[in-house]
């Protein structure tokens, strides 16, 4: 019976796709395919276990080609890396609900039957497909090393699709087949007669565990949503086409490394694929929604946000050459920094042995007065408003160091698959050839989270703090290596540690948390910006350099706007404007590393002059460019796509950065920023901006920064959940979550905010606490449980003190007559009780927008569908009574109702639902549909949980964007509802 239902569903789905007159590139699907579908995605598995369909239901494009879904590799005593192909196996396939299951009760390789079992699941979720896997190995003397799953083999790509990888923060390749199909730098070291491969390993200079194929209006997202952060390769292969001989049979997927021995099992349910509609920002939001379930990034110290650039300078080099002395710190080094508006020094080679020498001894340089003299110079430097960042290497152990020779080095270092120490060599040279070719330094590599090594790192951190530095920095801890992992050689087969990212994350968290409360402004930095590691850093040093034609860090920057990280690679006067402009466009800080840290910026006069100009602009518009939020292309329009343009949003202003990075001749563009008025602009080179900020003209590598002041109004709603509730919850009691609520309010920066479930004490304490943090609101609260409206269980409204003047509020009850307090909500099936429900209205005059007036109703509406529907008219009656001038009208609150409920349908006859307003432009809806999270952010996101609404009414009211902000704080929600807000442009 189920089989018939699936086939009928298949026919229905495909007919619907064709009926929409959409793109339909798919070949005929096998009659026996197993199908799952919703309004966004269709996925089907053939009876033979192939991927028969992976369709975007909105566009009709099918990315699948009935190709291979998985492969596996195992080792035996006689041979390594023996391949098992899914296409050679016979699965039992079944469907149950939204899950297709493939069971392989035995496997065959080269005609030999193996006692190994594989179970694969394909689960259709709202906006993606999740691919799960479970392995059982009962084959004696074998180990399953590698699983490639899921695979989209023979991927069918639209012509406009480009390949995005997260290498070095992000690269975008116009021709996926061309870049993947290239032969490697060591031809045929791999079996390239069969396929070509682009090597991309998460964490190994790859910032995110996702990649994608992005078109203008649709794309295919691949994400390994794996909170173990185990080794994951992004499978990018081009197989040889037997018909043409070309390497154009594209395959995309994920590679995992189970190392599953005989008698063991292994599972993974982390890999997802999402055909999506819209721009690449949709894919970014999918990844960020997953990241929010584990993200634990503390509030970055303000001085770090305000850091425009740093000078990275080696004082004493590896081979003993002294480049600068402690005296120079407050002399020519600081003078060079000040000449370009740089007030931070990233200090290398400050110890006796010199840079990349003697780790982890870092002996005091007694020839200069030791640590006492260094501490004195640091204090002088920072007393002038500067910041010193003190360098250590987080993993390298010099084999000539006292630490290594004491016997500690061999105990804590990593070992390879033979049990030998893993070594690294650094080939810095003098002016001859001897050092680099013959006498380079040799380092062992420490094992992360070894207790003995942890003590070393903590001791170094303490030393930096005691020296008075504003930050401690650990080199090479913000990423993992491709190869130098630690091996366990005690088993039948040697096994590498595949949890390198996890252990470095634990190490960085340990270091961060040691000073988080005691000295919150003492910053922690690391080299590399892998997301799982960067969450524990206050800033990161960009690695590797990424400044070629494929550079495209837009995706990473948009996904992680809160991170502070630098560029890398500009070391002289070559190609300065283009490189520096990139850092402004992408919100990076400048890593000033003249001649690879051997000199200071006064030795590069072209760079010095240009950076001085750019840093002056950064300082002038610091509220946006340094402290603001990167918002990519949102909030404005630019008429010329040939010019790069980005938005940075501050509390009250927006900066639009426009640059001519193409190297082409002079180009004009027109800039429009709805809901804002132009204030001023600054340019580099011969750039020009019209007096009203609408026209920009830029020559080769010119840049303009235009600043606009907000005239829009941000109106939202936030159910705070009563303080008396959740007292027994370790994480969500009021005292624990209050700092999260404050941080959430600061992040949303709402001009007008309706709030619900506010008890008496919090009606005073919360606005006061927000004011202490720089967000000053006036407020009004109404309790429907008291005749005079004063008391607990209240809902209220907050408005910015310096922007609005309030009229007289009027409260009411959601019943007939509205002036009489009475029980008017008898609950629903889950909650049976007697509630008093009400609301209030108020008029606010906008002092910033020429005295424009807004009429606002705030409510916490009935749970009972019947009671709610019966009395829904009360709100519109109140609006008509108290808004005779027909002012722009906003109706906000926790409605305890879905959009499909009768009451919601009634409200839409009078007001417009701001969420539904963007049905024709869903790219301007941010965050999940669901607003009620029930403290379960990883599970509850769907539209049925949208119960908090922002309605509007008025011909001159235009919503600019809708946001349901599911940001977590230390992995936790601030309330059991997400805040919801809408930016409105209100014409007067």
Give the label of every model feature segment:
Residues 24-42, 59-108, 116-118, 124-237, ...:
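Polysaccharide-binding surfaces and accessory modules of carbohydrate-active proteins
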Residues 264-271, 502-685, 698-708:
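Active-site-proximal substrate-binding groove within the catalytic cores of carbohydrate-active enzymes
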Residues 321-326, 373, 390-464, 553-556:
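Active-site-adjacent "subsite" loops/lids of carbohydrate-active enzymes
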Residues 752, 756-853, 964:
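Structured beta-strand-rich core segments of catalytic domains in phosphoester-bond hydrolases
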């Amino acid at each position: 019976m189920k089989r018939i239902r699936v086939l009928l569903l298949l026919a229905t789905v495909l007919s619907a796709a064709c009926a929409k007159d959409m793109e339909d590139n798919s070949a005929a699907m096998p009659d026996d395919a197993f199908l799952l579908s919703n309004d966004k995605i269709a996925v089907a598995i053939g009876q033979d276990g192939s991927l028969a369909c992976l369709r975007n239901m909105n566009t009709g494009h099918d990315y699948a080609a009935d190709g291979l879904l998985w492969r596996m590799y195992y080792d035996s005593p006689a041979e390594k890396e023996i391949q098992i192909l899914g296409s050679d196996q016979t699965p039992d396939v079944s469907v149950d609900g939204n899950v297709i299951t493939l069971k392989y009760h035995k496997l065959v390789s080269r005609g030999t039957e193996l006692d190994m079992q594989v179970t694969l699941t394909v689960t259709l979720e709202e906006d993606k497909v999740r691919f799960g896997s479970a392995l059982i190995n009962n084959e004696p003397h074998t180990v399953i090393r590698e699983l490639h799953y899921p695979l989209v083999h023979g991927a069918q790509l639209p012509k406009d699709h480009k390949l995005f990888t997260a290498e070095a923060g992000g690269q975008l390749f116009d021709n996926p087949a061309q870049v993947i199909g290239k032969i490697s730098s060591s031809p045929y070291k791999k079996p390239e007669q069969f396929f070509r491969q682009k090597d991309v390993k998460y964490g190994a200079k790859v910032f995110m565990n996702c990649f994608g194929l992005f078109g203008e209006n649709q794309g295919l997202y691949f994400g390994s949503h794996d909170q173990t952060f185990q080794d994951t390769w992004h499978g990018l292969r081009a197989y040889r086409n037997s018909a043409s001989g070309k390497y154009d049979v594209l395959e995309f997927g994920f590679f995992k490394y189970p190392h599953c021995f005989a008698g063991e099992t292994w599972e993974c349910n982390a890999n997802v694929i999402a055909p999506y509609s819209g721009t690449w920002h949709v894919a970014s939001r999918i990844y960020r929604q997953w990241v929010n379930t584990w993200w634990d990034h503390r509030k970055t110290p303000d001085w770090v946000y305000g850091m425009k650039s740093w000078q990275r300078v080696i004082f004493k080099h590896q081979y003993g050459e002294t480049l600068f002395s402690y005296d120079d710190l407050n002399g020519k080094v600081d003078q060079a920094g000040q000449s370009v508006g740089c007030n931070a020094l990233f200090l290398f080679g400050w110890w006796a042995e010199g840079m990349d020498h003697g780790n982890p001894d870092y002996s005091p340089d007694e020839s200069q007065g030791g640590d006492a003299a260094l501490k004195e110079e640091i204090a002088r430097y920072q007393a002038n408003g500067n910041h010193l960042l003190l360098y250590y290497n987080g993993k390298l152990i010099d084999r000539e160091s006292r630490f290594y020779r004491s016997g500690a080095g061999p105990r804590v270092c990593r070992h390879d698959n033979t049990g030998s120490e893993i070594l690294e060599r650094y080939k810095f040279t003098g002016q001859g050839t001897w050092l680099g070719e013959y006498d380079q330094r040799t380092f062992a590599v420490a094992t992360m989270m070894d207790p003995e090594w942890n003590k070393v790192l903590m001791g170094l951190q303490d030393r930096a703090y005691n020296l008075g530095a504003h930050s401690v920095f650990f080199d090479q801890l913000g990423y993992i290596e491709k190869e130098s992992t630690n091996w366990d050689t005690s088993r039948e087969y040697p096994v590498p540690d595949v949890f390198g990212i996890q252990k470095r994350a634990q190490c960085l968290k340990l270091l961060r948390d040691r000073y988080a409360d005691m000295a919150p402004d003492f910053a922690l930095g690391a080299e590399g910006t892998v997301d799982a590691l960067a969450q524990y850093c206050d800033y990161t040093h960009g690695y590797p350099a990424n400044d070629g034609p494929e550079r495209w860090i837009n995706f990473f920057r948009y996904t992680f706007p809160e991170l502070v990280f630098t560029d890398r690679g500009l070391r002289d006067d070559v190609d300065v404007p283009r490189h520096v402009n990139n850092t402004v466009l992408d919100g990076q800080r400048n890593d000033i590393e003249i001649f690879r840290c051997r000199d200071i910026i006064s030795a590069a006069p072209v760079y010095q002059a240009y950076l001085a100009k750019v840093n002056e602009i950064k300082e002038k518009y610091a509220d946006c460019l340094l402290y603001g939020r990167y918002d990519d292309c949102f909030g404005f329009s630019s008429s010329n796509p040939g010019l790069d343009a980005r938005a940075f949003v501050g509390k009250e202003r927006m900066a639009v950065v426009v640059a001519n990075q193409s190297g082409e001749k002079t180009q004009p563009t027109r800039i429009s920023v709805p809901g804002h008025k132009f204030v001023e602009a600054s340019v580099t080179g011969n750039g020009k901006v019209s007096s009203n900020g609408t026209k920009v003209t830029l020559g080769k590598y010119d840049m303009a920064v235009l600043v606009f002041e907000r005239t829009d109004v941000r109106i939202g709603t936030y159910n705070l959940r009563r303080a008396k509730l959740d007292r027994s919850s370790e994480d969500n009691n009021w005292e624990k979550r209050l700092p999260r609520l404050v941080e959430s309010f600061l992040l949303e920066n709402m001009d007008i905010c309706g709030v619900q479930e506010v008890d008496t004490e919090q009606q005073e304490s919360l606005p006061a606490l927000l004011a202490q943090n720089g967000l000053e609101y006036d407020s009004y609260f109404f309790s429907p449980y008291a005749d005079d409206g004063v008391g607990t269980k209240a809902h209220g409204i907050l408005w910015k003190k310096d922007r609005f003047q309030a009229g007289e509020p009027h409260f009411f009850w959601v019943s007939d007559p509205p002036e009489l307090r009475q029980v008017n909500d008898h609950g629903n099936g889950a909650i049976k009780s007697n509630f008093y429900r009400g609301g209030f209205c108020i008029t606010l005059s906008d002092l910033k927008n020429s005295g424009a007036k807004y009429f606002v109703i705030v409510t916490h509406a009935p749970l009972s569908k019947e009671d709610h529907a019966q009395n829904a008219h009360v709100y519109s009656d109140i609006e008509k009574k108290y808004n005779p001038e027909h002012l722009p009208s906003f109706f906000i609150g926790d409605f305890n109702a879905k959009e499909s409920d009768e009451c919601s349908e009634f409200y839409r006859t009078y007001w417009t639902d701001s969420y539904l307003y963007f049905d024709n432009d869903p790219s301007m809806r941010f965050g999940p549909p669901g607003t009620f999270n029930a403290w379960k952010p990883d599970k509850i996101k769907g539209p049925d949980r949208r119960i908090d609404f922002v309605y509007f009414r008025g011909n001159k009211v235009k919503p600019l964007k809708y946001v349901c902000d599911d940001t977590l704080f230390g992995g936790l929600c601030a309330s059991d509802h997400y805040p919801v807000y809408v930016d409105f442009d209100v014409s007067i």
